[in-house]
Every structure is written in structure tokens, then in C-alpha cells.
């Protein structure tokens, strides 16, 4: 551990300690007040990152278990801290995060992008629809729209814009402005189309269960959001193209796609395996009721399989 990480760790540890020595506000128990301090420290830890995010969260969980065991007076068991992990929804999102990381690590996300550019990216309007199809393909397995748009889609589309002579400070209206607007608006749409497309959907599903007492499956969510989502995805690039027309109309997409695919090389065995797992995961989530298998079971199988790649 270097000195910088050590100071970050000291700051994180100081937060719950300081809050713990302060009197609890009216209406809050001492336990709730200390847990708030741990929660706040975890958020700060995720921002300043003295360690990778999983390590920060594991430390927060461990600290919470120690506090609950000593301050609850027997009202709560330490296992209550882990109760959220018994939810099938949680494991569904975990598995989707695993898949999203695999898309980045294996390069399959990039390969899909360049294939789409080669097929339908001969015009700037076509490039707008490349962002649609790419985001739509990745959305079911990427429960972070920031990771999806910023980690996979944006770097590729940005490199295309730069290759076409469009840079943020010099010539954004050449093509870059249109493409960036397309990415932003498209990812907002795909985020609500699938339950596993955005982490915030977990909260929405819980509110639906609590208020309306409805149990919505992965397939049910996708079916309900599918029609409005598809309409929005078909219209969005065209509307942006009309409102912010790019200066470039034609694109040498074949050259861009060929160069990108050449850099990636032939499709590797890990990419093929990931593609197979991804398709099977989607089929499992969509037809879980017909197959008599719980969605969380499919999620855990997916996670276990991903560890083998």
C-alpha cells in the first residue's frame, strides 16, 4: 500500500468513528447512526478508491456485521446484514455485471461495434443507428448505463468521429456532436427497456412490488417496455439528425470497420464462449417460467460459467 492509498484509508476509517462519537439525532437509535457512518464511509470509498470497489464494499459489509453484533442488543442477528443477498433480484444484477465486464475484457463489445459499422455505417445517420443496435445488444447484460455508454460505445464512436476529422473543440458539428447526442439519448432509452439494463431498476421493481403488489419477471419487464422502447430507438437518431444535422453525410465505413477488426484479430475462443453464454442467459431469463427454472438460478449459473472463461 502506497502513502496515497494509506491516507485515503485513514479518511474512510475516520468517517464512521467521528459519526459514532457524535450523539444520534432524535428518532435514530445508536445502531442506525453508526450504520449511517459506515454507509457514508462506503460511498466515500467508492469515490476516492483506496482499493478496488469490491474490496471497499466487503470491508463495509464486515464492519456492519461487527456493529450489528455488538450494538443491536440481540434485536438483530449479524446475518441480517447479508439478508439482501438472499434476493434473487440481487443475483440477477450481479450476473449481468459479470457479463458486462466480460464484454469489455474479451473485446466482444468492440467486435460487435465494428461489425455494425461495416454493415450499416455508410452514412452518419447509419452511424446513429449503429449506436442504437450496439447499445440494444449490450443493454440486457450491462446494468450500468455509464459503463455501457462510457466504457464500450463511447470510445469506439469517438474514435470514428476523430477519424472523420471531428474534434470537440475544433469541429464538433462535423459529425461528433450528432454521434454524442445519439449515444446519450439512446442509452437513456435502453436503460428502461430491460430490468438488467440499469441498476436503478432494482429500486423501481421493489416499489412496484411494495405499492402495487405485482411480481414482474425479466421477460415481463422487457415485454412491457419493448414497444415504447423500440419506437423511441427508431425515431431518436432521425430526430437528432434533423435538429443537429452533421456536416458529413457519407462515411468510409468499410475502411474503419476493417481497421478495427484487424486490430482485434480473429474471433477468440473466449469471445465465442461469451457469446454462447450471453445468448443462453437471455433465453433462460425470457423463458424461465416455461422451463420451470427461477431467474436467479439462471443468474448464478451464468456467474459460475463466466468464472471459467
Label the predicted regions.
Residues 1-22, 145-149, 164-269, 273:
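Juxtamembrane and boundary regions of transmembrane helices in multi-pass small-molecule transporters
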Residues 10-18, 40-43, 62, 94, ...:
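Generic alpha-helical transmembrane segments of integral inner-membrane proteins
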Residues 24, 55, 59-167:
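Membrane-embedded alpha-helical segments and adjacent helix-loop junctions characteristic
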Residues 24-29, 72-84, 209-218, 289-291:
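Membrane-interface helix termini and inter-helical loops of multi-pass transporters
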Residues 25-30, 40-59, 81, 238-242, ...:
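Flexible hinge motifs at transmembrane-helix junctions and intramembrane kinks/re-entrant loops
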Residues 30-34, 86-90, 116-133, 168-181, ...:
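Membrane-interfacial loop-to-helix junctions in multi-pass transporters
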Residues 33, 81-91, 221-231, 295-298:
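Loop-to-transmembrane alpha-helix initiation sites
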Residues 44-52, 134-144, 184-195, 284-290, ...:
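Transmembrane alpha-helix interface/packing and boundary motifs in multi-pass membrane proteins
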